[in-house]
Regions:
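Mobile genetic element proteins and their domesticated derivatives, centered on retroelements
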Residues: 6-8, 45, 71, 88, ...
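Extended, low-complexity cationic-aromatic segments
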Residues: 1-72, 169
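Short, basic/hydrophobic alpha-helical segments
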Residues: 66-84
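Short beta-strand segments
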Residues: 6-7, 83-87, 111-113, 165
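Acidic, metal-coordinating catalytic cores used for nucleic-acid/nucleotide bond scission
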Residues: 13, 62, 85-98, 114-119
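RNase H-like polynucleotidyl transferase catalytic core
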Residues: 29-35, 105-124
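C-terminal anion-handling pockets and recognition modules
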Residues: 1-4, 122-171
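Short coil/turn segments at beta-strand junctions that form active-site/ligand-binding loops
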Residues: 1-3, 81-83, 107
Length: 171
């Protein structure tokens, strides 16, 4: 289990806000919700039992070039010989250059079966991370990056262990 590293992408939006609110009985819940839809941002990250080990945000969507940049500049230095990088079946993940970049540091590449996000603990990580980011109400890329830096402390090793356990990786 120590060698498993799950890599995935998540879509974010700069107009994300809390989904639920509470108020004193008889009072109306009040909060700020942007009127216009903000820009889309892709979050690429890697999760192991220590937590979120490598994350990068990019405006717009992810393609092979963006993912290759993530692998070579962000993920690669965090990997070790014997690491097993587990990814879903996004087209960018199957690029030969991506496989070569990961294997050049001594790691192996494995793919999840099609349509099986329930086997990937990073999906649960994204859920908790998005909840945190909604509460931060980041409206610019800079504030989103700062919120991401704060989120690394918000996600604990106990969370990661629980997500791995929930996905059946300890049975």
């Amino acid at each position: 289990m120590q060698n498993l590293v799950f890599v995935d992408e998540a879509g974010l939006n700069l107009s994300m806000s809390r989904l639920f609110a509470r108020a004193v009985d008889g009072e109306r819940a009040v909060g700020n919700i942007p009127r216009s839809k903000g820009g889309n941002v892709s979050l690429i990250g890697a999760l192991n039992l220590d937590g979120l080990i490598a994350a990068m945000t990019v405006p717009g969507s992810t393609n092979t070039e963006v993912f290759l940049t993530y692998v070579t500049q962000i993920l690669g230095p965090q990997l070790w010989k014997g690491a097993i990088v587990v990814m879903d079946n996004l087209t960018a993940h199957h690029a030969e250059r991506v496989r070569v970049a990961i294997e050049s540091v001594g790691a192996k590449v494995k793919f999840l079966p099609p349509y099986s996000p329930d086997l990937s603990p990073i999906e649960l990580c994204w859920s908790k991370l998005k909840q945190f980011l909604r509460s931060c109400e980041a409206r610019t890329l800079e504030s989103l990056d700062q919120a991401m830096a704060d989120a690394v402390n918000y996600l604990t090793e106990d969370d990661a262990f629980g997500w791995f356990n929930h996905c059946g990786l300890f049975t």
